[in-house]
Structure formats: structure tokens, C-alpha cells
């Protein structure tokens, strides 16, 4: 593994352990050339996925991009990082087990929204605001009003 700090190709594994509920291996590495320490994760990839964007453009599925978008939506929310890691791994496993290699971005967005709705409403709304391209406060009002159960009062 190449050192991200100095580019040396001879790094050493100092510690390996299961991560993300035993679906990944976490490795702590050390670079003898510069003394840098870094962590890598090794995961099973069942199949290479391709995302079909709404424009029709195709791009390779990027787990890191998915993780970044979810972590941005969940920033400063009271959810354990391990729980997010498990959720992200579950989303990826679900995508890989769909039987298709080409997956529309809309499908990925809906799966992410389902998962976020189960763990944190605020993160769910934040993600939806980007995914559904909210343009005004009214978009938020409409979306949030659909989340609330009816009060039984006539307006």
C-alpha cells in the first residue's frame, strides 16, 4: 500500500481487525520512510456497479461519495459513527444484491432516504433537500408537512 504522505510503496501493517460488523477489515499502517500512520479499510465487492445519472451519464459507483453525502447530511447529529458505517454498508450490500450492475441514481437516492428516515429525521430532511433539489423554504415546508402525522384538526 502506497503511503499517502510520501508515496513510499513499502508500508507496514501494524494492526488488523474486523470492522463495520465484520464486513470489512480495518488496517493501521505505518510508513518507515516518513513515519506516517494511516488507516485503510478492505471490503468485499460483490460486483462493479455503474450509476446512471438523470442526465443519462454513466459513472462508476463510488462508496466514498455515498458516504460523504450521508455524513454531510448527518453532521452534528447525535448518531454514533459506527451506526452510520453499518447503515452505509447495508445500503451498498442492498445495491450489490439487486442483481443489476446499472443502477439509476434515483434508486440510490430513495434507498438512502429510506435508511436515513429510520435513524434520524433531521438528517433525512437535510439529505432530501439536496437530493430533491429544494429551491425555497416552501419546499421544506411541504416535505416536512408530509412527514408529520395528521393532527385530526380541520384547518
UniProtKB/Swiss-Prot annotation:
Q: How is the cofactor bound?
A: Binds 1 zinc ion.
From the UniProt record, which GO molecular function terms apply? ATP binding; DNA binding; zinc ion binding
So which cofactors does this thing need? Zn(2+)
Q: Which GO terms describe its biological process?
A: negative regulation of DNA-templated transcription
Could you tell me which residue ranges the ATP-cone domain spans?
A: 49-139
Keyword terms, alphabetized: ATP-binding, DNA-binding, Metal-binding, Nucleotide-binding, Repressor, Transcription, Transcription regulation, Zinc, Zinc-finger
- The unnamed zinc finger ranges are 3-34
Highest rank taxon of the organism: Bacteria
Q: Which InterPro entries match?
A: ATP-cone_dom, NrdR-like_N, RNR_NrdR-like
Q: What Pfam families does this protein's entry cite?
A: ATP-cone, Zn_ribbon_NrdR
Task: Sum up the protein's function in the record's words.
Answer: Negatively regulates transcription of bacterial ribonucleotide reductase nrd genes and operons by binding to NrdR-boxes.
Assigned protein family: Belongs to the NrdR family.
What name is this protein filed under? Transcriptional repressor NrdR
Protein species of origin: Dinoroseobacter shibae (strain DSM 16493 / NCIMB 14021 / DFL 12)
Amino acid at each position: 500500500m502506497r503511503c499517502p504522505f510520501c508515496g513510499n510503496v513499502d508500508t507496514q501493517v501494524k494492526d488488523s481487525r474486523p470492522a463495520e460488523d465484520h464486513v470489512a477489515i480495518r488496517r493501521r499502517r505505518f510508513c518507515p520512510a516518513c513515519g506516517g500512520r494511516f488507516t485503510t479499510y478492505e471490503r468485499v465487492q460483490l460486483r462493479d456497479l455503474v450509476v446512471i445519472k438523470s442526465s443519462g451519464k454513466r459513472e462508476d459507483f463510488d462508496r466514498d461519495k455515498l458516504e460523504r453525502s450521508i455524513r454531510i447530511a448527518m453532521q452534528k447529529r447525535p448518531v454514533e459513527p459506527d451506526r452510520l458505517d453499518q447503515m452505509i454498508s447495508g445500503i451498498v450490500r442492498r445495491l450489490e444484491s439487486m442483481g443489476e450492475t446499472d443502477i439509476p441514481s434515483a434508486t440510490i437516492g430513495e434507498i438512502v432516504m429510506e435508511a436515513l428516515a429510520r435513524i434520524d429525521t433531521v438528517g433525512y430532511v437535510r439529505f432530501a433537500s439536496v437530493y430533491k433539489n429544494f429551491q425555497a423554504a416552501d419546499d421544506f415546508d411541504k416535505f416536512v408537512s408530509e412527514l408529520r402525522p395528521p393532527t385530526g384538526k380541520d384547518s
